[in-house]
Amino acid sequence: MSLALLFINFLLFPFDIDINCLNCSNQNSFSVLLITETKDWVHDSIESGIDLIVDIGDKKNFNVYHSDDSKVITTENLKEFNSIIFLNTTGDILNNYEQKVMENFIKNGKGFVGVHAASDTEYEWQWYGDLVGAYFMNHSGIVDRKIFTVDNTHIMTEHLNPEWNIVDEWYNFKYISDNINVLLKLDDASYDGGEHPHNQPLTWYQEYDGGRSFYTALGHAKEVFKDERFIELLEKGILYASNEDY
């Protein structure tokens, strides 16, 4: 980070624990906190995801603060953010204090975005499972699959065809919340390893416990983060969770 960017970062938000701002500008209208901590599998697409989210921030005029350590989740720090993004996090990454801070953050009307392995995180914290909307169970290999757009009149999916294909790893879930509003789904009957025949949710949004949540199971393969259809989907998901205009 340049000295100029460090200085802008300090002037904008003098955090009680240091957080790296990847694109800070006093011209940006809001900020998001990007978390990439892992206690289990580490996805090699994390850097691709970080780069994409910074690009989206530059395009939509928001600051992206990043950490791979959940200790930055404090009451004081979170006052500055519209939403938290968990990008391919895995395992039990938050302590009891950080969990409570995050709960209060959502209850105060803020937002959450989960990408891919965010559902492979915090299995012993059911509030989080409901925030994400599901818990990961197992996955297929990296294969080409057909995706069904449940409602392509919705603003988050209006750019997508009713049916489209993409190559990625595909999740089965051991828990799926009844509260989610499904945007994209798969037909599990069409491939070996599917465990939700004809109705496997892939991407969804919800209002939850006073705040907003957006999750997509896409995002294992690096190439997904270069796909224009996914890029626009994630952009709109971040803006939805952040309660900002599209």
Region spans (language model):
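Helical hinge/lid and interdomain linker segments adjacent to catalytic or ligand-binding clefts
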Residues: 31-120
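Active-site donor-binding loop signature of nucleotide-sugar glycosyltransferases
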Residues: 117, 187, 218
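A glycine-rich, often tryptophan-bearing local segment used as a flexible ligand/cofactor-contacting loop or short
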Residues: 92-159
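Oxidoreductase and adenylate-handling cofactor-binding alpha/beta cores
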Residues: 128-136, 166, 175-181, 219, ...
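Catalytic beta-strand/loop cores that center a nucleophilic Ser/Cys/Thr
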Residues: 134, 139-210
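Extracellular ligand-binding/catalytic regions of CAZymes and related secreted enzymes
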Residues: 17-30, 36, 59-62, 68, ...
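Bacterial Sec-dependent N-terminal signal peptides
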Residues: 1-27
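Extracellular/periplasmic catalytic domains that process cell-envelope and extracellular macromolecules
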Residues: 25-28, 58, 76-80, 95, ...
